[in-house]
Amino acid sequence: RRKKAAAKTHMRLNVGTMLPAFAVVEDAAHHDSKRADALCAGLKDGDVLLADRAYVDFLFLHGLAARGIFFVLREKENMDFEVLEERQHPDRRILKDQTIRLRGKLTADKYPEPLRRVTAVVEVDGRDTEMTFISNNFAWSPRTVAELYRARWVIESFFKELKQTLQLADFVGYNENAVKWQVWVGLLAHLLLRFLKHVSKWGLSFSRLAGVVRSAVWMKIDLLDALRKYGTAGGPKRPVIVEKQLYFQGFEPFSSRPVG
């Protein structure tokens, strides 16, 4: 019988390299916004934060803006605001481009400056979906705001890749420390596989790479050389099993039995 185990990984993923820059692994009871400060502590002036609406904490976002950091996040549905300016755009997929100010009792004091609000039609899994974003950058085109948020979805691909190739859905232990250690080991294994992919110039899928390394890890071979040659004429030959090894003595085929 499988037991239930829950762990939450908060991660800052570099969209350009698809590599984790910072991670926090903890039990699933904490809300995402509680770890936002730790995740973004290493961001610098001019960096761009792309995050889900779970990280919409206006005091936190105001702190980012004060540090010169830009952000693009999904709007919370219950956000209370007034429209200061509305801009028209010829792009039919841009439905709204507004300058707004928060007026909610719990939000107006936390972020007193104007915000950018963009509503756009975005393709999600092959289907058009209307989405609304908030940002503190007024220089970007509204299409850029929408496309930047789409880039955030690489983290979904990252976790899908992590779960599928390293089998993080099943745990050996189920207490808090056991689950945390297994997630950390999975992240480290993923990092090592990405390093192997880079140095070997691996051109096939990541799942194929994980499968090859998994099958070769106990073999005495030059792993990098094997990965570089994999799928080519110079690749490692498959081991050949001698036919005689498949039979007990006295039960060999007649062609294999000793004469005399």
Sequence positions of predicted segments:
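Single, function-defining residue in the core of a domain
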Residues: R1-G260
